[in-house]
Amino acid sequence: MKKLLIASTSTIHGTGYLEYLLPTLTVFFADVKKLLFIPYARPSGISYDAYTKIAQKAFAKIHIEVVGIHEFDNPKEAVLNAEAIFTGGGNTFELVYQLYKNDVLATLKQVLENGTKYLGTSAGSNICGVSMKNTNDMPIVYPPSFTTLGLLPFNINAHYLDPLKNSKHMGETRETRIKEFHVFNETAVLGLREGSWLEVLGDSITLKGTETGRLFEKDKIAKELELGLLIIK
């Protein structure tokens, strides 16, 4: 049975790394002593070691040891043997590129479908959808495929932002870009605002946190999703 926390962001304004999620993580990972961290997304281009130290500092507050996947000679074996797994945010293109390069995407999907607990934030949440096509990130590398874990029947647009009233910005809004996506694609997209996350237990998907979600479906008017159980096909 899938046991996933899929968060829009690792950090909300005015707080520390994962601070807003710690009460939830304390309960979710109550039986976990050691967690495998996947730092492949490298926010701001930081090293795997530096990124892993950030995760270690946060999880030390709830007495969980963190080890980076890059520390293992065999990353597939590390995924297979992990008590729990956390994929952090950064650049989704780089993350997916490395998951394919190290041949761990299929193994990651396998263990998560079989019940290994998982936390994803930002890019680590994007990969839980059918594809990574609704990332906000720049294509700094070219992964062999945009297909990702498919643990959700829809895609995630993390850090979803609503249009700002009276803004003079002339670029596309998130909603406009998602409409462009639906000209060529059928997959539904959930705009996940900062401060909210999905809790997935088996086939049950619950929107939690402080913000509503925004659901985009092809040829339909976008709609707000209240906190609580979601039914998205």
Outline where the language-model segments fall.
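Structural motif
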Residues: L5-I6, A84-G88, L119-G120, I156
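Flexible gly/pro-rich beta->alpha loop and the following alpha-helix that scaffold active-site loops
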Residues: I64-K117
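A short beta-strand-loop structural module common to alpha/beta enzyme folds
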Residues: V32-Y40, H70
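Short helix-loop-beta junction
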Residues: K53-E65
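C-terminal and late-domain segments of enzyme folds
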Residues: K2-D31, R42-K53, P139-K233
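Class I SAM-dependent methyltransferase SAM-binding "motif I" and its flanking Rossmann-like core
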Residues: V96-Q98, L105-S167
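A general structural motif
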Residues: M1, A30-L35, A82, G115
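Short, active-site-adjacent cap segments at secondary-structure transitions
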Residues: P43, F93, S125-C128, W197-E199
